[in-house]
Amino acid sequence: MKQVNGQKLLDSLGSGVAAIRGRLTPDAPMDRVTWFRAGGLAELMFQPHDTDDLVAFLKLVPEEVPVMVVGVGSNLLVRDGGIPGVVIRLSAKGFGDLELAGENRIKAGAICPDKNIAAMALDHGIGGFYFYYGIPGSIGGALRMNAGANSGETSERVVEVHAVDRKGNRHVLSKAEMGYGYRHSGAAKELIFTHAIFEGYAEDKTKIRTDMDAVRQHRETVQPIREKTGGSTFKNPDGHSAWKLIDEAGCRGMMIGNAQMSPLHCNFMINTGQATGYELEYLGETVRQRVMEHSGVKLEWEIKRVGNFMPGYEIREFLGRATA
């Protein structure tokens, strides 16, 4: 694993860090953060105490230093060479709030698990949130990628999103300003979402519970929920199901090292042991190539891949073609 010099970066931020209340960790292992349990080090990890602390810290970080944010670590593949700059990891204490915000409205912090908002909606007879019960991860990620499942998606429920930009300025975005599309948000990539307001509608609790039970049963039956996985690996292309294309290309159960396309649901990539970020990404790229050769359809990654390759293990060079 490549060693980085996070302490040097931390020292370069100057005396202003003394006023920061959150936790700063140089050379932080990302394999302890992601659901894949793989990947290199973050040069410097910051866990802000709250939004005010996040704002204060961002004002200290020079513009040339890269900054990225992670939530619970689902839907994220970190390369073995690690992540340069600052990784901001939001904590439940400062960003996990969940409360009613008016009639049929819910306020949820960015690190709040998706399934928790579904549970609160059930408790209060608010319809439209059942689908979150089957989505791994947190609200921040759902806002960023317009997460959805079982005929529901985030964009249908969002009213407004609160965020902080790279310079520490606060923003409030409407649903229109989020620019939602399929598994995509057009909001600036530099924005760090802190919380959002969602709106549903009055619905009978028995109906909500029935819908949530159906989501749970489906997920437990067809998804490898007890494995080390980041969720769906590829987006569904227009007119196709990614899993079916993968299956037809003969990639169900395919393995490279300790990385495998799940035999249970072949659009889920799993770490069967001590898979490296390289093995996971190489497997994904091999599947993309085979699907293209078999059906002529280009699969797009749904998993977010970040960080640097280890020298000599660049996926682009190894496959001899563009990766994405």
Swiss-Prot record:
Endoplasmic reticulum recorded as keyword: no
FAD-binding PCMH-type domain mapped to chain residues: 36-203
Catalytic residues (positions): R183, S232, E302
Keywords: Cell cycle, Cell division, Cell shape, Cell wall biogenesis/degradation, Cytoplasm, FAD, Flavoprotein, NADP, Oxidoreductase, Peptidoglycan synthesis
One cellular component (GO) term of this entry: cytosol
Locations listed in the record: Cytoplasm
PROSITE patterns assigned to the protein according to its UniProt record, in alphabetical order: FAD_PCMH
Family: Belongs to the MurB family.
Protein name in UniProt: UDP-N-acetylenolpyruvoylglucosamine reductase
Natural source organism: Rhizobium meliloti (strain 1021)
